[in-house]
């Protein structure tokens, strides 16, 4: 039988929790090492399932990968394999981020269409269009993205939407293209900035990271480097929301609060006291949270990854909240599980209207993705009795030491077979 969590509600969470490296950053950094022959070292890697999965992807492409605690040492060969059509690639979404580096380094790639979280359509149209503008052919053939180029040349690329994945794949091909590439409407997420920082350390010439317009001057080759992953803002915010929901007092370290300003402002609006330093923040909630409206948007807006936690918070807030999802269309299936817990919520697929109740009621629930799983656990913390959360392998893909950290903060939670 698959593992599950049993969460006993009613405890106030308090204490300090340290956040590790960002899941949404480390996997792309690992892929970027393919661009330079030799050994690169990435530190502050989170202890999550997706890191060894990405290591398997890189090994399948000819790299040597050593994982030691929070350190990944990746040796990229002089001629990486370009065919990424094997089981590890199909297991999770981020594996598609090897497309850009392979096209850049090998001038060809064959990458199996990836799996990952069940949160709606995430087409690769913009990835393909961007690579075509750089001079590559790029098509879907027999379940794989197949790309090839004689020469990559810089281009003016206008993204329809500031897609993180498309920005990163185009970026990692453009850094070794001839001439100058400009990406308009580029993603501004801290994870993209982190990737640009590492690429520049490798010898790339990327300007404008964190702004809507990114300029890349291609260079003939890149070199290995050492880089520290930024702290995980999504994990950090999850702990902040947990403090607000349980009327707790949690200090979160190892993350830049500048990456979370819209979230911290929403917690303040919900009645929490929020204090910040350069690399930490503290959330204290004394009363029942107030209802707040949330609309997900690309950075610097409210992250779509935190939408389930926003719904969980709204479910026990004083008043009615509207949560609007503007990024992934299928993310509201989480609401069905919240209704099992007694939440008063309804959705039309784009909005969720949630009328807060003083308390939820325990029930068996099932995770559909990483963040929905975390949201269900937070809901279990404020439900009466024991809530069983199933399919928790999703949570393990994105939250290091999740049960251990919750227990340290005072939650009553256990992992059972």
From Swiss-Prot:
Active site at 117 (proton donor)
Q: What class of enzyme is it?
A: transferase
Q: Name one GO biological process term.
A: regulation of cell shape
Q: Which reaction is recorded as catalysed by this protein?
A: phosphoenolpyruvate + UDP-N-acetyl-alpha-D-glucosamine = UDP-N-acetyl-3-O-(1-carboxyvinyl)-alpha-D-glucosamine + phosphate
One GO CC annotation: cytoplasm
UniProt subcellular location: Cytoplasm
Biological role stated in the UniProt entry: Cell wall formation. Adds enolpyruvyl to UDP-N-acetylglucosamine.
The protein, known as: UDP-N-acetylglucosamine 1-carboxyvinyltransferase
Where does this protein come from, organism-wise?
Mycolicibacterium paratuberculosis (strain ATCC BAA-968 / K-10) (Mycobacterium paratuberculosis)
User: What is the taxonomic lineage of the source species?
Assistant: Bacteria, Bacillati, Actinomycetota, Actinomycetes, Mycobacteriales
Name the gene. Answer: murA
